Regions:
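An extended, acidic, His-containing surface patch that forms the Zn2+-binding/catalytic region
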Residues: 108-110, 215-217, 274-340, 347-348, ...
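N-terminal helical capping/dimerization or prosegment-like subdomains
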Residues: 33-126, 348, 363-364
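A short core secondary-structure module
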Residues: 193-194, 250-274
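Sec/Tat signal peptide C-region and signal peptidase I cleavage site
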Residues: 28-32
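Active-site metal-coordination/substrate-binding segment of hydrolases
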Residues: 110-180
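Histidine/acidic-residue-rich, glycine-tolerant segments that coordinate divalent metal ions
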Residues: 173-256
């Protein structure tokens, strides 16, 4: 799961790998975990073993060979479980970029379903961690290790359940396909290749992404909500550069490059892009309103009914950064450089502007608006990262009802909320290629446990096993 963005798909070419999986058995599993530290039932022990093995691989951008080995290890487990060699394939769309695709063959009466995860992680500095980041720890009811949350638990949800269902002899009414990428945190080359050049390996009615959505606890441990990601904002980055002749600092000029750039930054900081809602964000506002105080809930419902309600939009935007990011496109300065000596006038100054653009909004319109804001200043605008447009995925009633039923069966009266994420995942490549994607990680966590990319990344032991069991049920439910 990228918190800070993705890179281009310009180099999406090369060889591929495919793994295909089939599932079966009508019985519904129990979510019971006797104790986070007791001996586990066989299927839960399998999940823990896979997670431990995965965390042991330092599958970072600096260690692509470790990413390859992690994918090979999962391929070996699947083949040992009975998947034919031709249905478990490793791919390398470009040098240092690896993936795995698995096909679980079914009766093939319906279009296949696709399940997504990524095996790569961001770098971790061992000295800063309380536990070795690349060795699975288990303490105080948590699994600790780099990638436990993002996204090796997701890989485990898929691989362990494919193995379990294969051994149980269950055959679905359609093929089930797993596509596991090894570069989601950096370039997204593998997912882009799967969605385009390798489309025949992953073509499906829709995809379920383990790297988005999930359950949310309150600070006191009550289950608050279950999120389904249906869309993502477009990630786009610009550089604004002011230049002039420079000179000696004892002879100031009115066209100082840093001063010009500061004016541009100030104008952009004072600008709000318009509120634009889509079906996902309208439903998100309506369904999540009950989780907020009455005044906020009223504003949420009012805005869902009328996106031109500027008063409601302003109250929500100023009270919560998450609301502001959900309602509108945002463009903010993230990096700054300029000048070459303390006693010299700067010849140039540059600011990096990172934009998160609402689905359905054209990136060129945002660039034109930035140009309008700084039009009278001598500043160049350059795109340094060209994002990939990814529209919202329509959410069929039957799919939503299936997820709601599973959530209620296992966790009771928990509101299910379709949502738009402000970050980026592999899902954007599939949406862009025409495959609907729904983020359903099913992992519950407290705000204090959101440590992806950070120190002492962790997930609850019970929450992990419950999410794997939920996926077991979901695979069987959706494949019929």
């Amino acid at each position: 799961m990228k918190k800070a963005g993705i890179s281009t798909l310009d180099k999406c070419f090369g060889t591929t790998l495919l793994v295909i999986l089939v599932l079966g058995l009508p019985t519904v599993p129990s979510f019971a975990v006797e104790s986070p530290f007791s001996d586990l039932p066989a299927h839960q022990q399998l999940s823990e073993d896979i997670l431990r093995e995965l965390v042991g691989f330092e599958s970072t951008v600096e260690r692509p060979e470790q990413t390859s080995k992690a994918l090979q290890a999962m391929a070996a487990r699947l083949r040992d479980a009975g998947f034919p060699k031709e249905d478990v394939q490793l791919v390398r769309p470009a040098e240092g970029h690896y993936g795995l695709v698995v096909r679980y063959r079914g009766i093939a009466e319906k279009q296949p379903l696709l399940f997504l995860a990524h095996i790569d992680v961001v770098t971790a500095t061992p000295d800063a961690w309380a536990f070795p980041p690349f060795s699975l720890g288990k303490k105080d009811g948590y699994y600790v290790g780099r990638g436990t949350e993002d996204n090796k638990a997701g890989v485990t949800q898929i691989v362990s359940n494919f193995i379990r269902l294969k051994k149980e002899g269950w055959v679905p009414n359609r093929d089930l396909i797993a596509a596991i990428s090894g570069d989601e945190e950096t370039t997204g080359t593998v997912a882009a290749w799967f969605a385009n050049e390798g489309r025949d390996l992953v073509d499906a009615q829709y995809a379920i992404n383990s790297d988005a959505g999930g359950g949310e606890y309150t600070d006191t441990g009550e289950r608050r909500a279950f999120w389904i990601q249906t869309s993502e904002k477009l990630y786009q980055t610009y550089e604004l550069t002011a230049t002039n002749e420079g000179g000696h600092s004892s002879l100031p000029r009115p066209d100082n490059a840093i001063q010009e750039l500061a004016i541009a930054i100030t104008r952009l900081a004072g600008h709000q892009f318009p509120v634009i809602l889509n079906d996902s964000t309208r439903m998100q506002l309506r369904r999540s309103a009950s989780l907020y105080p009455d005044n906020t809930a009223r504003d949420m419902r009012a805005l869902a009914d009328n996106e031109n309600d500027q008063a409601a939009a302003q109250r929500l935007s100023t009270g919560d950064a998450a609301f502001n990011a959900t309602l509108r496109t945002t463009c903010i300065p993230t990096m700054l450089r300029g000048g070459h000596a303390e006693n010299a006038l700067p010849r140039d100054a540059t600011v990096t502007i990172n934009c998160r653009i609402l689905p359905g909004t054209e990136a060129i319109d945002i660039e034109n608006e930035i140009a309008r804001l700084i039009g009278d200043l001598d500043i160049d605008i350059n795109i340094i990262y060209q994002g990939l447009a990814s529209g919202p995925s329509d959410l069929p009633d039957a799919f939503l009802e299936s997820i709601e039923s599973l959530v209620e069966e296992n966790w009771g009266d928990v509101v299910v909320i379709p949502s738009m994420s402000t970050g980026a995942t592999d899902g954007l490549f599939y949406r862009n290629a025409g495959i609907p994607v729904y983020g359903v990680s099913a992992m519950f966590s407290k705000p204090d446990d959101w440590r992806a990319h950070g120190l002492d990344e962790r997930i609850g032991v019970r929450d992990f096993h419950e999410s794997v069991a939920f996926w077991y049920q979901m695979l069987k439910t959706l494949s019929h």
